[in-house]
Amino acid sequence: YNLIEQIAVIADGKKFVSALIVPNFEMLSQALKDLNIKYKNTADLIKHSQVIEYIGKQLQKFQKDLPDYEQIKKFTLLPSAFTIERNEITPSLKLRRKVIYANYSREIEAMYK
């Protein structure tokens, strides 16, 4: 899915599925050209309501064939990728979920409030 660079899906022990999403900022800025959104940096861009809405609609299209209980209900956009340096991914680019959950615990908790 070319709008998403990285995604960490959160579901274990939760009432619904959520996700931390790192957009593919190059593809996103191409897709949003028509919306004429002004932003300084990626942190600024991901807070924009039109960006969140756009990614949400794309996510819905992508998940349409999944059973309801498997669909991502809420998501948080992140301004930068998960990295090996922060120990969030392995050298083979697998997600280290425990580290990601710890590093983004505030963002995760906010999705379940």
Give names to the regions the model predicted.
Residues 1-113:
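AMP-binding adenylation
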